[in-house]
């Protein structure tokens, strides 16, 4: 059965993650007030109470001084990019624009979640069975952690069960903002606690399973596995109030902790460094790319430190007459990868269709095109029947255990395409641990399979690309060869755990 309706929730009606539609304002000069982000410019005039904003400074000290001088309350600081999250009324927000050293004031826009034989279509299953990485082990993403920034995760889902009974989720965190003193912090949660319980609940659990679900056989005989079934998962829930500050706080946590995500003293074998983040959220209707946003500043710092960033391109469809792509995914920085949704027609074919809901870029402006396509339609992964997004799948299926009732479901969206790429990035870093995020991105794009559906391809920097599907369908085997470090296994060992092949 084909589910072509992507899981997309409206902010307010149901909790959804939506990145602010941000333009690219210029830095304030001289005595001119600092520019406002488009979202804040649109909403500030009607503000009657207080609002959270991101105050960007030429330095962190400038941003802190401006917030203090105007009497605003600090909620969080992003030390590495010189940004302070602060709460104030309309007059204070207007005043902070004119404080010395303030370069930009960004609104705390709401964010929205973007919602198989898929690993056959990507040749990912073939790669896990026939290739080995630089460590001599099957190419499963082993030795790499993937940070999933989303609604949270249920780490007890059977899809995450290791052979020893532990969970593939090695770190479980949540952004918490205190409604009384406005402070926002990223807090550690016990690994057996389900953080995916918001009104958007289920999205993060489903996404995490697509990244790194362990080989599992469902009671109906279906065999599933995630894109990188040997990777470890670090879940960062964006908190109970879904706004951009929560997602940025999660990215900032990764920036500060990617080398040892479980803390000092925990071995890399148990909890490997984070090498890629998955971000399956964005603004409804796309928006202009904003290089001054905190999101972009954070992902550029991550790239410089060897961490790739993967974005779902959005679920707004389009015809190429305008860009509906997710703004931060348009970042030209190497290692920032935007993903369109591909439909393999439930057969594993590599000559399927670009999903009709997958957001298109603007024809002729390659800066707005998605980078790559990956399966995002009819994807079966971990879920729970009581979680709202899981219930939209209408195809609950039982896991291997007697109590694993309805622990899997089938959902569609670019949210499901992006984690395929995040898992594949983990595989490629296992193949060549010394590769840079830019080299990994180039390997993925330059080796993509040119499926014919949709818009015609045109010449791009790394071959041919198109406004709807980017460079084509990801090819894991070819990308692994391009990034280097792999060898062909005589008999690659299947990932430990139960059987499963990401349907």
Predicted ranges, named:
Residues 59-62, 81-83, 91-93, 109-113, ...:
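Solvent-exposed loop/turn segments at secondary-structure junctions
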Residues 170-179, 330-426, 478:
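Extracellular S/T/G-rich loop segment that most often corresponds to the catalytic His/Ser-adjacent loop
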Residues 38-43, 267, 271-278, 374, ...:
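C-terminal subdomain of the subtilisin-like protease fold in secreted/lumenal serine endopeptidases
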Residues 62, 214, 235-335, 346, ...:
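Substrate-binding/access-modulating region of protease and related hydrolase catalytic domains
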Residues 1-28:
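Secretory targeting and sorting signals
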Residues 4, 31-35, 61-136, 142, ...:
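Autoinhibitory propeptides
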């Amino acid at each position: 059965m084909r589910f072509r309706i992507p899981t997309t929730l409206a902010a307010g009606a149901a909790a959804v993650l939506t990145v602010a539609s941000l333009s690219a304002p210029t830095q304030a000069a001289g005595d001119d007030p600092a520019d406002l982000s488009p979202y804040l410019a649109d909403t500030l005039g009607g503000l009657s109470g207080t609002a959270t904003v991101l105050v960007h400074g030429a330095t962190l000290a400038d941003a802190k001084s401006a917030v203090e001088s105007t009497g605003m309350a600090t909620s969080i600081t992003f030390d590495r990019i010189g940004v302070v999250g602060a709460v104030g009324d309309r007059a204070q927000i207007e005043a902070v624009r004119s404080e010395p050293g303030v370069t930009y004031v960004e609104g705390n826009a709401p964010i929205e979640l973007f919602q198989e034989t898929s690993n056959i279509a990507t040749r990912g299953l073939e790669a896990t069975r026939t290739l080995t990485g630089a460590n001599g082990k099957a190419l499963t993403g082993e030795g790499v952690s993937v940070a999933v920034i989303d609604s949270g995760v249920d780490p007890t889902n059977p899809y995450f069960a290791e052979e020893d009974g532990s969970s593939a989720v090695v770190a479980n965190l949540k952004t918490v903002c205190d409604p009384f003193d406005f402070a926002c912090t990223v807090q550690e949660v016990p690994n057996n606690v389900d953080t995916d319980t918001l009104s958007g609940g289920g999205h993060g659990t489903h996404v995490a399973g697509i990244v790194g679900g362990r080989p599992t056989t469902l009671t109906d005989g279906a065999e599933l596995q995630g894109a990188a079934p040997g990777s470890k998962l670090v879940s960062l829930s964006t908190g109970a109030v879904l706004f951009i500050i929560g997602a940025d706080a999660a990215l900032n946590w990764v920036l500060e902790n990617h080398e040892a995500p479980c803390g000092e003293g925990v071995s890399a074998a148990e909890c490997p460094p984070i090498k890629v983040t998955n971000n399956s959220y964005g603004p409804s209707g796309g928006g202009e790319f904003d290089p001054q946003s905190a999101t972009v500043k954070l992902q550029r710092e991550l790239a410089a430190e060897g961490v790739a960033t993967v974005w779902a391109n959005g679920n707004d469809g389009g015809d190429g007459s305008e860009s509906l792509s997710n703004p931060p995914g348009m970042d030209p920085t190497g290692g920032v990868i935007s993903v369109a949704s591909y439909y393999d027609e439930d057969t594993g074919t590599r000559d399927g269709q670009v999903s009709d809901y997958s957001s298109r870029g603007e024809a002729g402006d390659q800066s707005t095109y998605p980078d790559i396509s990956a399966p995002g339609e009819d994807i079966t992964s971990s879920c729970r029947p009581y979680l709202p997004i899981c219930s939209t799948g209408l195809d609950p299926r039982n896991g291997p255990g007697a109590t694993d009732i309805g622990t899997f479901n089938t959902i569609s969206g670019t949210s499901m395409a992006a984690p395929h790429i995040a898992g594949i990035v983990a595989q490629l870093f296992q193949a060549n641990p010394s590769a840079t995020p830019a080299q990994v991105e180039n390997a993925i794009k330059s080796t993509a399979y040119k499926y014919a559906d949709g818009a015609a391809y045109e010449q791009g920097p790394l071959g041919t690309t198109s406004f709807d599907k980017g460079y084509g369908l990801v090819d894991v085997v070819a990308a692994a060869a391009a990034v280097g470090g792999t060898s062909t296994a005589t008999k690659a060992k299947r990932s430990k755990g139960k059987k499963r092949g990401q349907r």
